[in-house]
């Protein structure tokens, strides 16, 4: 219903996933504690109240893919932000023998590629944007599946100038996720004019990351020209 109403307003609907994590307080973890990355025989390390799923195991990949795909099949969802906000620790797998534990990291990355390949083939209309704690997954491998990647969680317009300049030395501007964020900036507290924030974001994919109903009218009046 929500997606239909959004579409009726002439807008497309997007969703933000973080599918590579598992909460200890979840039915999935209680049923399959060995699906979390951990050194066999030792307790895993929680971070952000999460463990990382062991994507070196095909059964884990299939399970997570189906969970994501079932949501996308349920409605006209045309954008996905695929996020990964946790470092990998306790690099070990209950699905690999002792002499092949070193394969985990490589197999993990191949599994992410596999899931995103399946996703873009089943949903060819989908705009996929990768993200990992900001721009940690900004690399050619991810760009094969997603035409844009979130450049950095630092959305301060002044700092973004240097971030985007450096990224543009290697990657096209069209790949760099860049938004007009709120003011004062959530991370630095810096106040930057709305026009300046718009100009900086226009050097990337451009979007708004704020509540437009709560910004000053003079700023709101600039939006039609920025998006034209």
For the regions a protein language model found, what residue spans apply to each?
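Aromatic-lined carbohydrate-binding surfaces of glycoside hydrolases
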Residues: 1-5, 9-48, 65, 69-73, ...
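Glycan-recognition and catalytic regions of carbohydrate-active enzymes
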Residues: 209-228
